[in-house]
Amino acid sequence: MAVKLKIKKGDNVKVVTGDDKGKTGKVLAVYPKTLKVVVEGCKIAKKAIKPSEKNPNGGFINKEMPMDISNVAKVQE
């Protein structure tokens, strides 16, 4: 089922529900199949990273996680 999404990558949105309610940010990614978006600076999670050539020590990074598209509203510029 194809759904026409009103929110696109690069749009400025405001979070209307959840822990980050009231925050605004730019949309970094849109996932139409799961109806989720990734908003800059919202829904930050701490993720473990295994040691690799890029990151020899491993450790933790803070990463934006996808949130439901119904939890954000487009902001007029």
Swiss-Prot record:
UniProt entry keywords in alphabetical sequence: Ribonucleoprotein, Ribosomal protein, RNA-binding, rRNA-binding
Pfam family of the protein (one): ribosomal_L24
Gene Ontology CC entries for this record: ribonucleoprotein complex; ribosome
Domain of life: Bacteria
Any one GO biological process: translation
SMART domains membership: KOW
Molecular function terms from GO: rRNA binding; structural constituent of ribosome
HAMAP family referenced in this protein's UniProt entry, alphabetically: Ribosomal_uL24_B
Subunit structure: Part of the 50S ribosomal subunit.
Free-text function comment from the UniProt entry: One of two assembly initiator proteins, it binds directly to the 5'-end of the 23S rRNA, where it nucleates assembly of the 50S subunit.
Family (UniProt): Belongs to the universal ribosomal protein uL24 family.
Designated name of the protein: Large ribosomal subunit protein uL24
UniProt organism field: Campylobacter jejuni subsp. doylei (strain ATCC BAA-1458 / RM4099 / 269.97)
Origin organism lineage: Bacteria, Pseudomonadati, Campylobacterota, Epsilonproteobacteria, Campylobacterales
